[in-house]
Amino acid sequence: MNNIGITVYGCEQDEADAFHALSPRFGVMATIINANVSESNAKSAPFNQCISVGHKSEISASILLALKRAGVKYISTRSIGCNHIDTTAAKRMGITVDNVAYSPDSVADYTMMLILMAVRNVKSIVRSVEKHDFRLDSDRGKVLSDMTVGVVGTGQIGKAVIERLRGFGCKVLAYSRSRSIEVNYVPFDELLQNSDIVTLHVPLNTDTHYIISHEQIQRMKQGAFLINTGRGPLVDTYELVKALENGKLGGAALDVLEGEEEFFYSDCTQKPIDNQFLLKLQRMPNVIITPHTAYYTEQALRDTVEKTIKNCLDFERRQEHE
């Protein structure tokens, strides 16, 4: 096979460096575009059938049409989720969309960190210490081994989280459409009713949008914690804020947030933030917010770039044999 070309959109410098380092090993010519893909830059690298996009790129039907006209037949998204792409329109136009299933360890480790930070009141402790207030908080932390953790979704990341939870000696409940590991699977309502901590690891689609809303929160244990390292719209933020304000939930740790594209990955130090939900959550001592960074490790970067290249090569090989 001759060298193939891949157009890489929405590429940060560390990703660009990794593509430049790895592409020659696979006989690939990578064209790096810093901007997210759009109708105006769809022709930035003509004759490339394959493109790569990041999860920050919202790819609508009109952008897909521009890509199709530019000769694009394949999109590899540098993410596990594909909810930022109109996959229905892509299928209609004959454009194949694939995700990149990078190592789950980065997100699983981060999830465990958030769980521990939530149950040990780390945000309040750090805030007090930064003000030179070294008194012990009146709200004592909890021991994970005494708690029941409900894991929603047992794909690669959910399984990795369960493996880590077992080391802490806590009881684990799981809910998933497919039962892929040895764990105590229970109906979703039963998981909510019996878990001290609920952690979300399902993809975002029409079935999982607002999988946690008013009814689900009311079924959760009084004082339970909610952890989300999946996708923001898995949780109805309005209902979450209400439950935190009235004390129904004991706390939350969120690496993703509904509407995060307004502010995550941007320097907002010199401009006001209008998202009232974010501002309310940030003010709460029992809520941890981080900017969709659970995946952000050197290992995940290497995995993502290498698997993106391999995805594109596999597609090109299939095209040759058709």
Curated annotation (Swiss-Prot):
Cell wall biogenesis/degradation found in the keyword field? yes
What does the UniProt induction comment state?
A: By vancomycin, mediated by VanS/VanR.
Q: Which of UniProt's keywords are assigned here?
A: Antibiotic resistance, Cell wall biogenesis/degradation, NAD, Oxidoreductase, Plasmid
A biological process from GO: response to antibiotic
Please provide an example of a Pfam family that matches this protein in its UniProt record.
2-Hacid_dh
Q: Tell me a Gene Ontology molecular-function term this record carries.
A: NAD binding
Catalytic function, reaction form: a (2R)-2-hydroxycarboxylate + NADP(+) = a 2-oxocarboxylate + NADPH + H(+); a (2R)-2-hydroxycarboxylate + NAD(+) = a 2-oxocarboxylate + NADH + H(+); (R)-lactate + NADP(+) = pyruvate + NADPH + H(+); (R)-lactate + NAD(+) = pyruvate + NADH + H(+)
Active site feature: R231, E260, H292 (proton donor)
Keyword RNA-binding part of the UniProt annotation: no
Can you tell me which residues bind NAD(+)? Q156, I157, T229, G230, R231, D255, H292, T293, A294, Y295
- How does the annotated pH dependence read? Optimum pH is 5.6.
Q: What is its EC number?
A: 1.1.1.272, 1.1.1.345, 1.1.1.28
- Which EC class, in a word? oxidoreductase
Q: Which CDD domains match?
A: HGDH_LDH_like
What does this gene product do?
Required for high-level resistance to glycopeptide antibiotics. Catalyzes the reduction of 2-keto acids to 2-D-hydroxy acids, exhibiting highest catalytic efficiency with pyruvate and 2-oxobutanoate/alpha-ketobutyrate as substrates, producing D-lactate and (2R)-hydroxybutanoate, respectively. Together with D-alanine--D-lactate ligase VanA, gives rise to peptidoglycan precursors that terminate in the depsipeptide D-alanine-D-lactate rather than the dipeptide D-alanine-D-alanine thus preventing vancomycin binding. Shows a slight preference for NADPH over NADH as the electron donor.
Q: Which family does it belong to?
A: Belongs to the D-isomer specific 2-hydroxyacid dehydrogenase family.
- Its name, as the record gives it, is D-specific alpha-keto acid dehydrogenase
Name the gene behind this protein: vanH
